[in-house]
Amino acid sequence: MVYQGKYRPLIIFGTSSGAGKSLVVTALLRIFSDMGIDTVPFKVQNMSLNAGVGIGGEMAYAQIIQARAARVYPSVLMNPILLKPEENKTHVILVGKYYGTFSSGDYMRSKKEEIYKIALECFNRLQSEHELVIIEGAGSPAEINLDNDIANLRIAKDVKAKGILVADIERGGMFASVVGTLELIDFRDMIGIIVNKFRGDESLLYKGYEFLERKFGITVLGTIPYIEHNLPEEDSLANWTKKEGRIKISIVKLPHIANFTDFEIFESIEDVGLVYAKKPEELKNSDVIIVPGSKLTVADLEYLRKEGFEDEIKKQYRDGAFIIGICGGYQMLGKYIIDNVESKKGKVLGMNLLEDSKTEFFPYKKTNRIFGHILHPYFYGYKIEGYEIHMGITISRNYFSKIYREGNRYIKRFDGSYYKNVIGTYFHGLFDNTKFTESFINYIRERKGLDKVKLKIESLDERINKIANIFKKKVDIKKIIDEIKIS
């Protein structure tokens, strides 16, 4: 292979899901960017319900964060295959556009090779335009039951990448998982190992590190302490826990929830309590209820109705709670949904909390980076930016915001709806706009007789820099550079 850049590609493997691959990629991208190296992220295939919009359409939110770390604009070339699970099937996004919905077996048997070739072309484009591509693997490269895994060894060997193995010591059994992984995989270009999430005396690990070097000839590049980084996690849905605070914000835990990054910012805001409601009674005494996005809007609306969530949401609204619907949640709050695409159930009544909002689904999806300002009288004029990913068009009258830009194109259109204490919007990332979020939290605080506060929210760049600085101190960056640099 002829390398277009100055460096061989670098792939980050993990001993398991959740080992810290995304974190390591993010840190290295920022470190190399700081060094003046033109670096970009790449992940062949990502299975995630957290999606965003980059150049070319829809892509995994993790690679959008990584592009930010590299200080480049996110592109669908960085995540050519996005798998979004729904029921017993998988919704496939290929190079930013909807490709089809398949059972896992059908996708593995009939589509994977065809799609992989397209993904490899995306990698080659990135490699030709940048100095260094850092690839994030998926899960573990040692899944011996999978003979057609395209996200780990296949891509690594096809592009002749050098590798780093990330191991999570917090779970226990770290040395066994490293030894097992290295024994099971046939990969001769491993630079070294990064041990992640360590708490305690590092010297206690040195004997094990010496064993790994004797057995495999591979050194440990660094030991990373446990970091409270507050970056969005691909699998963070599994880690939801209740958070206490005088302001109670309740998130309705939909069966087919999508884009739960929309409210992760509340995890880091002091005195804000978070409840991820699995039962209607958990919504009681809420100050704010958020109905999030959904992969299957009508199915989730019917679930809310059947399980008693709709009645409780309406009761909380009457008691003064602020109700917010984002994307599919917005559609559910309206008067009705006409769905001949997803559920094919035709006209379905909504919750009617936004009675001027009526939605009809169409077989195409809108994916845009959007910029606007708020029209709601409580928060009028605040500038917001985010992205929209949705099927369907919603007609309303009392618009929540005015959009003035889509991507690089200046336009004039409107988004969402509001009525008193109910807001519906297609703006994913709404609460990442910290000036608006501070105003919103203080509005809720004032209603409860609490003093206004200045929110202490670190920007995404500040959080990335904090992680990168730890890695600079703890990881042998020079060895990595020496191994991948093309002489």
What are these regions (language model features)?
Residues G334-G386:
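A conserved active-site-flanking secondary-structure segment within enzyme catalytic domains
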Residues M1-K315, F322, L375-S487:
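Flexible phosphate-sensing "switch/lid" loops adjacent to ATP/NTP-binding sites
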